[in-house]
Amino acid sequence: MGSSYFFGYVINWLCLVYSGWVLTVKLTEQELKERVSKMTIWKKREQRAPHKPLLLLLALSKLQAGEKRLTYEETRLKLKELLMEFGPRRRRYCPEEPFVRLTTDGLWELSESVNKNQIQDKLLLEKRISGGFNPEVLTLLEKRPAMRQEIAEQLLYAHFPETMHQEILQAVGFELATTPRKRRDPEFRNRILKAYEYSCAICGFNVRLGSQLVAIDAAHIQWHQAGGPDQEENGIALCTLHHKLFDRGVFTITNDRTLLVSEEAHGTSGFKEWLMRYHGTEIRSPISPMYRPKLVFLEWHVREVFKGTARHIYR
């Protein structure tokens, strides 16, 4: 009887110790990075959906400023603005969707539960819903401020081209302590630059400092972050200025290699010289027809990056 009692006591004690250990297990830095990388992103063929990444970057910025919670009422307009600026052109932008659905990724929580089958902007406003990082994520981000930087870089590299990183950081108000390192495939760069004779396919810019080529990039037409391959048919050599304008959707390129400027683009100094003078003209051809951009990649750029309708071409 005594031995049975003692045995039961030991088992109960071990269970309590085990339970306590489980409850005190903390989220590790690697686990957080894995959750971010495995975050569910809405997909339909090759359409872009940067909703969750932009919301997380905005939340990281708020946390950096000492704000742990985001009210939906205050967040919706800013998130919509970010989606319009850095996302593809859409009829509706639906900031309520990521604000609620991010709870399924082990990163986010809401002030109260919301039916994911009936996500409504009006309902979130009426209930004054707020959101923020869940306790274990928040604890790690507060204890290790450097993780905020690392997660921000992870989100940027996974979902946006490098030409947009600084603008996105400025738009969300996040201060990055270190400049993100470039992670380009050197072979892709070399093949593209060779295909376009080491010159910008639009303006012909070609400058060297000694033997080093300066300010010429190998640009993906369909972004690498959106599944675009490192192939010549998905690349074009551009100077850093035209690369940035191309990635921001200021202009696009048609299947017959005609450059078209967006109606939404405008400006004063430099606008005519660096954009409008090339509007409606054919960009330079690569050294071989086999390197010409494929229609599937050009169509993706028009659909997912180009901002609005093209300007009229006056002959």
Predicted features and spans:
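Aromatic (phenylalanine/tyrosine) cluster motif
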Residues: 5-9, 18
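Mixed-charge, low-complexity interaction segments
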Residues: 10, 21-183, 256-262, 269-270, ...
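A detector for short metal-coordination/catalytic motifs
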Residues: 22, 208, 212-315
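Short, charged surface segments at domain edges that flank catalytic/cofactor-binding sites
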Residues: 151-208, 221-233, 313-314
